[in-house]
A protein has these predicted regions:
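Predominantly soluble domains enriched in secretory-pathway, periplasmic, or organellar proteins
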Residues: 1-278
Length: 278
């Protein structure tokens, strides 16, 4: 994981534009030997990238508004928690929600004030991927994370303007049959929140689970993969389909109806398909 840098490329030509060194001191003031960029996401509202620095426990804000497209500096370093991994946004795009998975926390960063808004204690080793948000019938807008180290989904309030009483607090904990989850996904057109259990050690690695948005409870778990492990759900643009990988040297991508969860088609002969991005 060396060197500790990020590089900005031209989006059309892939020509390197600038290389920037990372800060090498963590949130406790300790000088680091390595500092990994764990995730990069683009703000929905401002010309910035939000960058998670794993070992440092810092969320950095990178400004890409230079009209000459030559300078892409870090303009804010926000102390958060170690060790940061993957994350995404709330429904407004104003808050960045990232897992500090070795600390068993979700971190909430306010991108408008560029400050730490909250930390949320979760289960063991939260791993939301880009995460998921939806409107719960009781709690309003929520986000959620699944976990590698524990078989549960932690759902937390994510509407500080509309529901400040439960903002950034756990409101539901939904038990899964196994630990080992890597991704949790949904779409406004689907009634489900879907969770994989890819790293399950109890025989559930071929299954995905469907949580009902209407009831806030686990509805069913069912096998999708045949040769390997089910991993990473991705919806198509209109939310009518969800694509799931069968992670195996003789793998496949399985397309499900996003409402009935019935299989529509299966693309086979794919060696270890993993992420799919729309």
């Amino acid at each position: 994981y060396w060197p500790p840098q990020y590089v900005v490329y031209d989006g059309l030509t892939l020509e390197p534009k600038q290389r920037v060194d990372l800060p090498m001191v963590d949130i406790d003031g300790v000088t680091l030997i390595e500092n990994r960029v764990a995730s990069i996401v683009a703000s929905h509202n401002d010309p910035v990238w939000v960058v998670s620095l794993k070992e440092a426990g810092i969320v950095s804000i990178v400004d890409y508004s230079d009209p000459g497209r030559l300078n892409f500096p870090i303009v804010s370093n926000i102390p958060a928690a170690k060790f940061l991994h993957d994350g995404g946004f709330d429904h407004t795009g104003n808050y960045f929600l990232v897992a500090a998975n070795a600390s068993n926390k979700m971190v909430v960063v306010d991108l408008q004030t560029r400050s730490l808004a909250a930390t949320i204690d979760t289960g063991a080793v939260p791993h939301p991927g880009r995460g998921v948000n939806w409107q719960d019938p009781v709690y309003g807008w929520v986000n959620a994370t699944s976990h590698i180290g524990e078989g549960k989904v932690s759902v937390y309030g994510a509407d500080p303007a509309g529901r400040p009483d439960i903002a950034w607090q756990i409101v539901r904990e939904i038990t899964l049959p196994s630990a080992g989850s890597l991704f949790i996904k949904s779409h406004p057109a689907s009634p489900w929140v879907l969770v994989d259990m890819t790293l399950s050690a109890t025989g559930d690695e071929k299954d995905i689970c469907a949580i009902s948005k209407e009831t806030g409870t686990l509805d069913r778990c069912f096998p999708v993969a045949t040769n390997g492990r089910a991993v990473h759900m991705e919806f198509n643009m209109d939310g009518s389909e969800v694509w799931v990988s069968d992670w195996d040297p003789s793998g496949a991508v399985i397309v499900l109806d996003s409402t009935t969860l019935a299989e529509i088609r299966r693309f086979t002969g794919l060696p270890t398909p993993t992420g799919k991005f729309n």
